[in-house]
Amino acid sequence: MEKPNMRNYYAIKVVGGQEINVALMLEERIKTNNIKGIYAIIVPPNLKGYVVLEAEGLHIVKPLIAGIRNARGLAQGLLPRDEILKIVSRKTVGPTVKPGDVVEVISGPFRGTQAQVIRVEEAKGEVVLNILESAFPLQVTVPLDQIKVSKR
């Protein structure tokens, strides 16, 4: 059920692994042909084989994808807006820690050791730890999902 002059989300089937290439070709075609009515090209990181277009209608999307290499056609129906928001929203991974917290490493080569948080790199999803049980200062970087907070 397409709504006129509304932003709808269309899933384009794509050859697996070619999502970025198809998105770039779509962008180039939109720019060179000065196509109006396309608002976004979304390449979902966890949805292989699809590129999502935010557009006014099917009458704009179908001619746009015609002849694009590695584009296999449109998926049936529209994607709901809340599904798109789930796909593109950033998810927090692991516990929330601050520098100075004492944590326990729960997996990896340092499993079971106590450590103090030196620095949190949220963009990478990692923390830099100072291992407390070593004889000399030993700093290691581990993913956030490999630690558990012991003391704050």
UniProtKB/Swiss-Prot annotation:
Coiled coil: none annotated. Keywords: Transcription, Transcription regulation. One of its GO terms (biological process) is regulation of DNA-templated transcription. The keyword Transcription regulation applies. SUPFAM superfamilies: Translation proteins SH3-like domain. GO terms for molecular function: structural constituent of ribosome; translation elongation factor activity. GO terms for cellular component: ribosome. Signal peptide: none annotated. Residues 99-128 form the KOW domain. It comes from the Archaea. Belongs to the archaeal Spt5 family. Heterodimer composed of Spt4 and Spt5. Interacts with RNA polymerase (RNAP). Stimulates transcription elongation. HAMAP family: Spt5_arch. This is Transcription elongation factor Spt5.
